[in-house]
Amino acid sequence: MVVTLSKVDLNLTAIKSLIPVRDKDAYKNLFGHVLIIGGNHAMGGATQMATMATVNSGAGLTTIATDSANLPAIHTVLPEAMIMDWTDVSAIQQMIEKVEVLLVGPGFGMDNLDLWQLIKTTIASSKHSLRIILDADALNLLAADLAEEDKTIQELLSPDNQHEIILTPHQGEWRRLSAGKVPADDQASIQNWVDQAGAILILKGSSTEIYVPNELVIYRNPGGNPGMATGGMGDTLAGMIAGLAGQLNKTVDAVKLGVFLHSYIGDQLYEDHYVVLPSQISKRIPYTMKEISKKEL
């Protein structure tokens, strides 16, 4: 059967309606608790950038599980976040059971296999539903597990999975995830892969595309610019989506809002900057959300 997919461009009018309105009596527990696991001793900055984006996107609470070498720097740069040593197995298991949103991958590294196994098994046995974003090294570890037909991963990446999973690959990561069998320009085959995996796919590129399980619509983001071609942009996007996922009723709305805001802010900065830094984007998130919410469209 030939599947016909329609394309919808993300735009300011549609995005404005997704920005959550905060009641006067709102408190932090209403806006989600995010756990970010990442940042080995060499790549602590990736986790810092993801966390900065999560905090500035409005997450009620943010906890980082990272290499102990990163703790002093994170305490200094991100006093809003809580921190834990990722070698504390019991604490990580308890935190996964406690939070609403889990982001794994920024700066995680490919050799941290024991922690990856712990995360997989804890998620699989979790008693509550999570919104899970897998980014960067987590995608490469996921691809390796799929190639080896890892049973836990096969159960997690299925339509029957209780969790809502978001995958954020760029072109190279997508080749590994799909084992090179699904070209990035074969949209019908990508949609079929997404339907079977039961996961939302953000296929990053010059025009980022969002695929949703069992939907016949591809959401396309036309924004972005060459000034954003710098390390940490993906970490920042993943952090933004994590922060928004705890605030919105629909996970796909958090994805659309995060993807749009990321490039929208980047395009604004690019008007006056040759290079757009991820930290610049994060700092402008609260201002831009307020600005858009007040616009007359």
What are these regions (language model features)?
Residues 264-297:
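Charged C-terminal helix
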Residues 23-88:
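Substrate-binding N-lobe of the ribokinase-like
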Residues 29-36, 215-227:
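Glycine/charged-rich beta-loop-alpha catalytic/anionic-binding loops adjacent to active sites
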Residues 23-30, 42-43, 224-241, 251, ...:
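Short glycine/threonine-rich catalytic loop with a Thr-x-Gly-x-Asp
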Residues 2-12, 63-223, 290-297:
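Glycine-rich phosphate/dinucleotide-binding loop and adjoining beta-alpha-beta core of small-molecule
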Residues 61, 245-258, 267-272:
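Phosphate-handling active-site elements
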Residues 1-28:
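Positively charged, low-complexity intrinsically disordered leader regions
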Residues 42-57, 63, 112-114, 139-142, ...:
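Short glycine/serine/threonine-rich phosphate/pyrophosphate-binding segments
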